[in-house]
Structure formats: C-alpha cells, structure tokens
C-alpha cells in the first residue's frame, strides 16, 4: 500500500544504456516516461506551520446531531502521536489533507483492534482561491498536536474508496485508514462538544 510519504519520496527509475545509438534512443524514451510518471504522480506538498482556518459555514450542531454522529461511527479515546498537513494542487482544484496517527487507549463504540489508527480529513476547493498562508480544516483539528488527548469519532475507509484528484483516482487508504468525523473532550464521564454534553454510557449502549 502506497502512503503519502512514499509519494513525496518516489523517484523515477534509471534507464540502462545500450551503446551510443541505443543510449540516445533510451534517453528520449526515458524522458517521455519520466514526464508521464511525474504527471501521474500526485504533487503532494507537506505544509509546515500551517495557519488553520474554517472556511466552510458549519451548521450549528444539536444534541441529537452529536449523538447520531457518535453512535453511527467508531468512537475511541486516544492520544495524537503525529500530525501532517498536505496540500495537493491539481488543475483548478486544491486539496487540503490532514493526517493524524492516534494511539488508542479505549474503544468506546465500534471496533478498532489496532493499537494506533491513521486518520485523514480532506477539504477540496475548486475555482475558489484560498490565500497561500491559509490551511482549511474541519472543526476540532486545529488544536490537535502530538500529545493531544480526546474522543475521536471516525469511520473506516472502505476497500476501493477513491478520491478524484486532478482526474486521477487516488486510493483514500494512501493517506489513512479512517475518515475523521469529529473530536470531543471527556469531562466527568461525559462526552463534551462545545456546550453539548452526552453521558458516555448513552453512546456505549445506544441501540443495544
């Protein structure tokens, strides 16, 4: 499985020279395929020290919305180990991807067998200029840094799921195994998001 870090590091294959005439021919062929290869590869740019913004108007979440979000996804309590921020320019579209590795301490709802999970969140803007210094993210991501603890609601990336990035079908699993939905805090046995409070037992036992 190719991950985004391999996309950053991917280099074209060397070509073998077969004599003077063959070498010239190989150089021409090699140049053609290198161009094709570079055109096909994603122009992944790792963004250091991004300035986070929320550019999409998020509807105000109600208590039932929060409960449905948690009940219908995998919910874990864990600690952020690593964060990366990627920008991909493709034609008139720009993708902003946040990837996080979270060490799972407790599975509150659903199944997550691995000790760590790789989460991805993506924002795509087409024909809408975003200032170079800005990096759009979903709510709850901006203050995630290594060491941040929280309750994460995620959904597993389905096998074969792809994003169309610049006309290229790109496997979502190149960036993560789970899609970010929301991050909450844990306070006195309850899940808290803004001013909404849900007893953790209400999420654990819903539908049972």
Residue ranges of each PLM-predicted region?
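Structural detector for short beta-strands of small beta-barrel domains
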Residues: 71-108
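Netrin-like (NTR/C345C) domain of secreted extracellular proteins
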Residues: 2-53, 93, 128-208
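Short loop/turn segments at secondary-structure transitions that flank enzyme active sites
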Residues: 86, 108-110, 156-160
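N-terminal post-signal-peptidase region of extra-cytosolic proteins
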Residues: 58-65, 82-88, 127-141
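Intrinsic-disorder/low-complexity, polar/charged segments enriched in Ser/Thr/Lys/Arg/Asp/Glu/Gln
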Residues: 73-75, 116, 149-151
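N-terminal, intrinsically disordered, polar/charged segments of Gram-positive cell-envelope systems
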Residues: 37-71, 76
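"Short basic amphipathic alpha-helical interaction patches in structured regions
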Residues: 92, 116-120, 167
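Mid-length scaffold segments of soluble, non-membrane domains
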Residues: 98-133, 140-148
């Amino acid at each position: 499985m190719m991950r985004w870090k391999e996309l950053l590091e991917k280099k074209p294959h060397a070509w073998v020279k077969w004599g003077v005439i063959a070498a010239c021919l190989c150089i021409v062929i090699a140049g053609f395929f290198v161009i094709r290869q570079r055109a096909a590869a994603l122009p992944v740019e790792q963004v250091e020290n991004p300035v986070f913004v929320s550019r999409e108007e998020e509807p105000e979440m109600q208590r039932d919305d929060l409960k449905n979000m948690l009940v219908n996804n995998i919910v874990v309590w864990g600690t952020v180990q690593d964060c990366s921020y990627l920008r991909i320019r493709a034609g008139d579209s720009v993708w902003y991807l946040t990837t996080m590795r979270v060490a799972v301490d407790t599975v509150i709802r659903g199944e997550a067998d691995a000790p760590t999970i790789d989460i991805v969140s993506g924002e795509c803007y087409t024909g809408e200029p975003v200032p170079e210094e800005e990096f759009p993210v979903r709510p709850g991501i901006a203050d995630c840094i290594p060491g941040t603890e929280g309750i994460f609601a995620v959904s597993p990336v389905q096998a074969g799921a792809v994003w169309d990035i610049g006309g290229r079908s790109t496997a979502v699993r190149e960036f993560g195994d789970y899609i970010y939905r929301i991050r909450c805090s844990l306070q006195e046995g309850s899940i808290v998001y803004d001013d909404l409070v849900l007893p953790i037992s209400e999420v654990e036992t819903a539908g049972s």
